[in-house]
Design a protein with these regions (language model features):
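FMN-binding flavodoxin-like domain, especially the glycine-rich phosphate-binding loop
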Residues: 9, 16, 48, 74-196
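N-terminal beta1-alpha1-beta2 submodule of the flavodoxin-like/Rossmannoid cofactor-binding fold
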Residues: 1-93, 185, 189-196
Length: 196
């Protein structure tokens, strides 16, 4: 991911750009789906981006729009709580904040959506919220992550209910890949609307 302070400034200088982008994307990815969505957002919006790092979250204060793209783990968008805990310190009140969770559940299922957002602490007064289709390839799981993923597949019934439990187990067995640039269109349009 691009460092918003160093790499992005160098890129703008090389392209003779004088204006700092208005949007920062914070990507929290372990296996690449969130990074793929982030790259598509960079390409479409000319945004800066950084990988999640607790010590560098203060960079969010430099931008008008913040897009958080993180994996959904046990119905929680990874590390988004750090943004909520520090939003006053970073001066994020009044800024456009978009939260995107990436997971293997059905983004169109309201029950799945509501459970993820409730557990992630994303209040509607705070931000726009989206769930993007992710992917799973169990052969790529690191050895340390396998027991946690197996536990998730069992616990998904308790966390999400029967319908989502059956779906995520089926998708896990099939090595589901739903990552799709078209899923970002509402996010892109929401940012573009702030530029008119």
């Amino acid at each position: 991911m691009r460092n918003p302070n160093r790499t992005a400034n160098k890129r703008r200088a090389e392209n003779e750009e004088n204006v700092r982008p208005d949007t920062l994307i914070v990507a929290n990815s372990r296996y690449g789906s969130s990074n793929q969505y982030t790259q598509w957002l960079i390409d479409r919006l000319g945004a800066d981006a950084m990988s999640y790092n607790k010590q560098q979250l203060g960079y969010t204060s430099l931008y008008r729009n913040i897009i958080w793209v993180g994996a959904i783990r046990d119905a929680v968008i990874s590390n988004v709580h750090m943004l909520w805990q520090n939003h006053h310190n970073f001066g994020l009140d009044g800024k456009k904040i978009i939260i995107c969770g990436v997971g293997i559940g059905d983004p169109e299922n309201p029950d799945y959506f509501n459970k993820v957002m409730a557990r992630s602490g994303c209040g509607p007064e705070f931000c726009s919220r989206y769930i993007l289709p992710g992917r799973i390839d169990q052969s790529r799981l690191r050895l340390i992550d396998r027991p946690q993923f197996d536990k998730f597949l069992i616990d998904s019934k308790r966390i999400y209910g029967e319908e989502t439990h059956l779906l995520v187990n089926e998708r896990a067995a099939d090595n589901y890949n739903g990552v799709d640039a078209r899923a970002l269109e509402p996010v892109i349009q929401e940012i573009l609307a702030t530029r008119y």
